[in-house]
Amino acid sequence: DHNDDWYFILTDVTDPVCVTALCKWAESTEPTEAALGAGVEDHRKFYFGQTNDKEYVNEYGRSVVTYADNLAEWADAAWVGSVGPFWPESVTWKWKVPDGVSVADLRDSERDLLEENRVNFMTAEYKHEYMKNGICGDGNFIDNVLGADYITHQIRENLYEIFIANKKIAYTDDGFALVA
């Protein structure tokens, strides 16, 4: 039996080639409108990974990659553990401090490159340590992508419940009010 009812994926893989493959795979899980219209279930996924490659580039919008000097700190898992349990619309991923994650030892040029390449990292700025920038590989904020996925899922669930529970939805103000 196959259970595809999950959302986040994290692995212990840190090799850049494998991280990129997982980012690409997560990107491929978002169904097209045509597929959804044909009845394909929406089981989109979201990948969190980490690397110690200061030149790594993340190009995929359904993934987040963190940079860490010490991969044994599992910055990606610590970040998901500190923010993931909250409802998508109730939390911002930037500015969070995952437990047990050290500030990366980076020169300014390396920090700039990581930001340009859409890779998140622990930073110390203005006497505060936090995860920067809270973005996915396409530059969108993590909370925006997770929130949009959550809203999409909830709308679909609610519409199915309405259509199943009602014999007919009239094409009237009352029908529109029921669906709205």
Enumerate the language-model features and the residues they cover.
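Alpha-helix initiation/capping motif
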Residues: 15, 107, 171-173
